[in-house]
């Protein structure tokens, strides 16, 4: 009956792989970004706990969705006056430099206007 110990080892290995996969792929809650933020261009960015956002600045009013995975946020505009070349998602690493300060570093984005706005320092309003 060599099969039984081998099956136990195989099941234990599969179980450990499953547990490890669950632990490493779970997205982070959007908590660190939730709030209303403003930058030096006068943009006001409201990020909600449900993964939606709203941006109002002197030129545009845009809304959409965002997801957070670790320290990376992916932004997808879904409506409003979107600039040319800004239909696709943008990905940025974020860092809370203090309770009321937030900075972003470009990971990937084709939208020049969004890059210019997002990569400025943001302060809680």
Task: List the predicted regions and their residue ranges.
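Bacterial N-terminal signal peptides that target proteins for export
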Residues: 2-11
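Bacterial N-terminal signal peptides
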Residues: 10-20
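Lipid interaction determinants
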Residues: 20-125
């Amino acid at each position: 009956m060599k099969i039984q110990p081998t099956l136990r080892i195989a099941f234990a290995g599969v179980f450990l792989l499953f547990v490890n996969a669950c632990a490493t792929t779970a997205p982070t809650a959007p908590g660190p970004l939730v709030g209303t933020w403003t930058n030096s261009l006068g943009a006001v960015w409201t990020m909600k706990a449900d993964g939606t956002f709203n941006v109002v600045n002197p030129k545009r009013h845009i809304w959409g969705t965002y997801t957070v995975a670790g320290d990376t946020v992916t932004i997808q505009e879904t409506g409003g006056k979107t600039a040319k070349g800004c239909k696709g998602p943008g990905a940025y690493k974020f860092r809370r430099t203090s309770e009321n300060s937030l900075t972003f570093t470009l990971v990937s984005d084709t939208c020049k206007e969004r890059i210019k706005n997002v990569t400025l320092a943001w302060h809680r309003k």
